[in-house]
């Protein structure tokens, strides 16, 4: 299968750049799965999104993202976000506590991290 170049960039750092076979996330219009040669589009991510990047012969990347945008061309996916954490960087207890916050932005960030950990749909 042809590869899709993916770049995930947060305000503070370039999180990941590489080739993938499939990208999944949630936008304000609904869930989206992107394969190589996808039609071009721009979409806004939901505040509590998780991005899953599938790579040939490697484990999937699961990344919690805080808001942002997704840009798709036939050859590439670019995801620009406020904040992001790899699954391996997430403190599950802190994410759970944040998800129960009265502050909606904090709660959304907690839910995004729980999704990346596979603890929330």
UniProtKB/Swiss-Prot annotation:
The lineage of its organism: Bacteria, Bacillati, Actinomycetota, Actinomycetes, Mycobacteriales. It is a peripheral membrane protein. The keyword Ion transport applies. It comes from Mycolicibacterium gilvum (strain PYR-GCK) (Mycobacterium gilvum (strain PYR-GCK)). F-type ATPases have 2 components, CF(1) - the catalytic core - and CF(0) - the membrane proton channel. CF(1) has five subunits: alpha(3), beta(3), gamma(1), delta(1), epsilon(1). CF(0) has three main subunits: a, b and c. This is ATP synthase epsilon chain. One of its GO terms (cellular component) is plasma membrane. Its main location: membrane. Belongs to the ATPase epsilon chain family. One of its GO terms (molecular function) is ATP binding.
């Amino acid at each position: 299968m042809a590869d899709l170049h993916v770049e995930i960039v947060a305000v503070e750092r370039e999180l990941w750049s590489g080739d993938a076979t499939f990208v999944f996330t949630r936008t304000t219009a609904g869930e989206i799965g992107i394969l190589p040669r996808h039609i071009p589009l721009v979409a806004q991510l939901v505040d509590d999104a998780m991005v899953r990047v599938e790579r040939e012969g490697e484990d999937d990347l699961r990344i919690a993202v805080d808001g942002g945008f997704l840009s798709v061309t036939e050859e590439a996916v670019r995801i620009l976000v406020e904040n992001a954490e790899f699954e391996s960087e997430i403190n599950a207890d802190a994410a759970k506590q944040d998800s129960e916050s009265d502050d909606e932005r904090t709660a959304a960030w907690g839910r995004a991290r729980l999704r990346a950990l596979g603890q929330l749909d």
